[in-house]
Every structure is written in C-alpha cells, then in structure tokens.
Design a protein with these regions (language model features):
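Short, glycine/charged-enriched secondary-structure capping and boundary segments
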Residues: 36-38, 68-70, 110-113, 212-214
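Active-site environment of divalent metal-dependent phosphoester hydrolases
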Residues: 30-32, 61-64, 96-108, 162-165, ...
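Active-site neighborhood of phospho(di)ester-bond hydrolases with catalytic His/Asp-centered motifs
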Residues: 22-25, 53-58, 90, 94-100, ...
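N-terminal active-site segment of His-dependent metallophosphoesterases
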Residues: 1-82
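Active-site-proximal segments of metal-dependent phosphoesterases and phosphodiesterases across multiple
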Residues: 72-73, 191-215
Length: 215
C-alpha cells in the first residue's frame, strides 16, 4: 500500500517518552504586526519548550487594509515571517493549516503563502495532494526515540475558506477519503491503528449537533 501524498518529515519522541505540542491559533495580523503578539509567542515558547508548534489557521488577516495597497506579495510575506520568526529562530519544528482569513480579500494565494512558510528550514508543512480539495493537507509521523517505530501521527487538514455567501466551508468528502487512506496506510505499515491528533481551523459542522440551547 503506497503512502498517500502529503507525508511530511518525521519527528521523534524524547527518550523519556514525552513529546510536547504547542498550538498557536488566530494571530490574525498584518505586516504591521503587533509587537505584543510576537513577544507573547516568544515567551510562551521559552516557557513551554515544545517539540513541535502547530499554527492552526488565520495567521494573517487577508482583509487587513494594510494589504490593500502596494506590493501584496511582499506585505503578506512580511506578516507571515513576523509571526513565524519567534519559532524558527529557536530552531523548533513547526507546521500549519490555513484558516478562512489567510487568503481572504486582499490576501495572496495559499500557494504563494506556502512558499513563504517553506522558506523556513524548520517548516514541516507540505502542499499535499493537488487532486483533492484544500491546500496543505499533510501528516506527520512521531517516531519512537530510536526512530524505529511509528508511535503517533498528526493530521493537518485545510478546512477551506469562507464561501461567497459568507458562511464557512467544511472539510470535503475527498479530504475525509484522504485521511482514511493515510490512516489505513499507517495501520498496514504498523499492524494497528496509530494514535493520532487532527488539526484544522474551522470546526466540523457536526459539532452543532451536540450543542444545546441554555437559558
């Protein structure tokens, strides 16, 4: 069974069996990046000392007016670099998914943004399978400390962008099929289902089914 498109470079558990993931969500900034945000990220990294950082979408706000004029490519790249640099300068591996605001309005394409992210040596994200919905669907194996066994896996799925009517999109059936293919590939390779986490920006619509109205 062949590995589905989107496999990223593997990471390893520490010898003591630990692996710490730090999630950074919705920084929603522009090239005029908040110094407080950048400082906060740096202090959080120093406090938590993660083995992997996962940005879970809306790193930038494509609707930001500072992107409306001038060189958008340059400004968006600057915004991404400002947010990611605290992670990269500490040589911490990181990956990301896109949110509904990253390529909205004055933003640039996800393909162009991926190039900026991939310019950082510690970026693990992959563009993913071009034949399915979304951009950047990928997965990361977490190996045993000796690198011999796949003990854990992280899936990262693009939950797509806002639709023209203003509603948020949802993960597609073909993306779910891709996930199942990767899951089954890992089972075939290891002999059992691999414990996993899945990161995406927009929650699945089914979450509404478990919500209850309260007084």
């Amino acid at each position: 069974m062949a590995s589905p498109i989107g496999k990223a470079k593997s990471l390893k558990f520490k010898k003591d069996g630990t692996f710490r993931i730090m999630q950074i969500a919705d920084t929603q900034d522009t090239n005029i990046t908040s110094k407080n945000t950048v400082e906060f990220i740096g202090k959080a990294l120093d406090s938590e000392n993660p083995d992997l950082v996962v940005f879970t979408g809306d790193q930038i706000k494509g609707y930001g007016l500072s992107f409306a004029t001038g060189n958008r490519d340059k400004k968006v790249a600057e915004a991404i670099r400002n947010i990611v640099t605290p992670v990269a300068e500490r040589n911490i591996p990181f990956t990301f998914v896109f949110g509904n605001h990253d390529d909205q309005a004055f933003g640039i394409s996800k393909e162009k943004q991926m190039i900026v992210y991939k310019s950082f040596p510690t970026c693990l994200a992959e563009p993913g399978d071009p034949s399915i919905s979304g951009y950047g669907n990928h997965y990361i194996n977490i190996l045993s400390s000796d690198g011999k066994k796949i003990l854990f896996n992280i899936y990262l799925i693009d939950s797509l962008s806002a639709s023209l009517d203003g509603h948020c999109s949802a993960v597609s059936e073909e993306q779910i099929a891709w996930y199942k293919s990767a899951r089954d590939y890992l089972k075939d390779k290891t002999g059992d289902y691999v414990p996993s986490l899945l990161f995406q920006h927009i929650p699945v619509p089914e979450m509404w089914n478990v919500l209850k109205e309260v007084p």
